[in-house]
From Swiss-Prot:
Residue sites binding substrate per the record: 169, 180, 187, 201-204, 209, 272
Active site as annotated: 140, 178
GO molecular function: ADP-glyceromanno-heptose 6-epimerase activity; NADP binding
List of residues binding NADP(+): 10-11, 31-32, 38, 53, 75-79, 92, 144, 170, 178
Subunit relationships: Homopentamer.
Keywords: Carbohydrate metabolism, Isomerase, NADP
Gene name of the record: hldD
Any one of the GO BP annotations: carbohydrate metabolic process
E.C. designation(s): 5.1.3.20
Cofactor(s) in the UniProt record: NADP(+)
Reactions it catalyzes: ADP-D-glycero-beta-D-manno-heptose = ADP-L-glycero-beta-D-manno-heptose
Protein name: ADP-L-glycero-D-manno-heptose-6-epimerase
Similarity comment: Belongs to the NAD(P)-dependent epimerase/dehydratase family. HldD subfamily.
Domain writeup: Contains a large N-terminal NADP-binding domain, and a smaller C-terminal substrate-binding domain.
Amino acid sequence: MIIVTGGAGFIGSNIVKALNDKGITDILVVDNLKDGTKFVNLVDLNIADYMDKEDFLIQIMSGEELGDIEAIFHEGACSSTTEWDGKYMMDNNYQYSKELLHYCLERGIPFLYASSAATYGGRTSDFIESREYEKPLNVYGYSKFLFDEYVRQILPEANSQIVGFRYFNVYGPREGHKGSMASVAFHLNTQLNNGESPKLFEGSENFKRDFVYVGDVAAVNLWFLESGKSGIFNLGTGRAESFQAVADATLAYHKKGSIEYIPFPDKLKGRYQAFTQADLTNLRNAGYDKPFKTVAEGVTEYMAWLNRDA
């Protein structure tokens, strides 16, 4: 059995889909369906069982055996970069992850987990998986950074696989439940379909991020499980493309609309990553050599998925 925490969420459900595509259905999805809208991410997928996050954590903390576990993909977390409840964030993203990690280490279970490019904070170059480059801007980024630091202490002594992925700006199918935290491509598509002008912040041609398609993210996760490699790796494309490029690809698909530029909100000033670009040196050195979709390729594929019933 493979366990996917956050399996009804964005990246988790895409990992479940990637496993299904390989014929793997003996999957336990762990999630919190308090937001009932997330169930739609699982409707077309095949899993063996579902467990609530709190029930799962109780079993993990009590050391209960959950059966023959091949691996745990730990995608479950609070991923809101605007959430400032530090206790909630640390409980969800740090303590929970530590409990799961030790459960896996004691049983020799591969543990593959979601870290984040938010660990790098506001830097504009050298996004390298090393302490001197890490300075998160928000408590979400700090919770991810602190767990990476915890893992670094354990990695040299670990007898089973531990791998963390620093996700950059992931976009693609199954993110609709994320609301304001969904990708720019998702929001632009919604605005166009509602007959509105798609909106970007002023200066969006200068805001550049490493936008990575979620299908590529899932593929990297599965490759690492098969390879058995351990470590903490950036997971982006290695390219920085502008929000304007995302909008251009969205408009090109829809063949209509023009961008309305809106003022940059004061509340985000100083807490906003204006530039991200994954350094893929470690990922490539680990042996992952497949290409990543460009914004034009990924957004076009995503638009086709979003508008498949239109």
